[in-house]
């Protein structure tokens, strides 16, 4: 285990509270001004990083002390991450920027098991955290020669028009069975499929309308997308899905697929472009288009359902909002949920929050959690139709993890046997959440060839053949499902 770097931040509350201010997050009606003062850090490793792997902040909210623990989101980018834009004559320009020492963090509030946080530390602190069921935002005021930040509740951000924002989901069938209750699901007794980690290698495309919306500032667009994906990855952690950004495209010379007022037509054209062009030069599982287009009928996002591993249909489109990154991230999480086969929530679905990610209408309140219905349907689908998500089992190379492992962040890193999250959240009996080691007597914690914490017998089919392919079999000595040596 690594020694966690502690950085204490003393936040002195300004003698008055602001009544109204315009921030990147919008027009805020009520806020506190605070001044982060960084106490000298503990000795660092010989190799210096601009952004620490782990930090701790202390401040007060409503007069009560809060301790915020942050850990760098080391799984944010894939090893082969690339960025592509286009010259004025349409020539493709691809770069591979260094992204290991980035400034995007996840975290928690000490002594609050239900807390979450997503923070950018690139230029001051910017992001949100959940404390005792309420969402707060922190953002730099960007005053000359000042470290002043604003802390405010989401309810104090002026909302846009109250018209219901709708999600559009394209079905490939006319009807489907309703979501079953948890008691009706036929889960394996050991739950090994439930605990199996899955990986979505994601490409995000900023269309030409978004490029012009931000005055051609590719750096700003990239930063916006990093922040969105940092929130998105946190949304999917409880589902044991790791989302890694593997590519970013900016259509700087013009639209490369049709973008119209019709969300259906725009989605269809984007899917055709992905199959025809993007897949031929960039390996990935899913592509999402971030667009500056305002679609008709109050559509905020559109996606195909149960399409995650389909060549054309593993796509979604999401409307960009300049000031509301968390809002865009939650819509994208919603559309990817449809790609995974998850339906809209019914009125009876709950998620211990004011709104859930898969609500049919988009709430102004941040929706950071999937409902019980969404989780149950997802688990049911991967048990009864595992081939529909076959592309999500190829783990990204661990060489992209360049900093020491952090136990409890859900990511299996070098030196760990398993990682099922913080002890309060871990539900895997094969994994000791406090040490990220296997529990006594366990041979494995997850994997297609792991059953009841033990390796499955040699010769057990772990991956059924598709088409002219061959079945894959467990070897009896590992939890993974090795490729059949007879594969051509």
Curated annotation (Swiss-Prot):
Membrane-traversing stretches: none
All residue ranges annotated as the Peptidase M12B domain in the record: 198-394
EC number assigned by the record: 3.4.24.-
Annotated catalytic residues: 335
Domain Disintegrin: 404-488
SUPFAM superfamilies named among the record's database cross-references: Blood coagulation inhibitor (disintegrin) (SSF57552), Metalloproteases ('zincins'), catalytic domain (SSF55486)
Keywords from the UniProt entry: Angiogenesis, Apoptosis, Calcium, Cell adhesion impairing toxin, Developmental protein, Differentiation, Disulfide bond, Glycoprotein, Hemorrhagic toxin, Hemostasis impairing toxin, Hydrolase, Metal-binding, Metalloprotease, Platelet aggregation inhibiting toxin, Protease, Secreted, Signal, Toxin, Zinc, Zymogen
Main location group: secreted
Remaining remarks: The disintegrin domain belongs to the long disintegrin subfamily.
Function: Inhibits ADP-induced human platelet aggregation, inhibits bovine aortic endothelial cells (BAEC) migration, has anti-angiogenic activity and induces BAEC and human micro-vascular endothelial cell (HMEC) apoptosis. The metalloproteinase domain may act in hemorrhage.
Name the UniProt record assigns to this protein: Zinc metalloproteinase-disintegrin agkistin
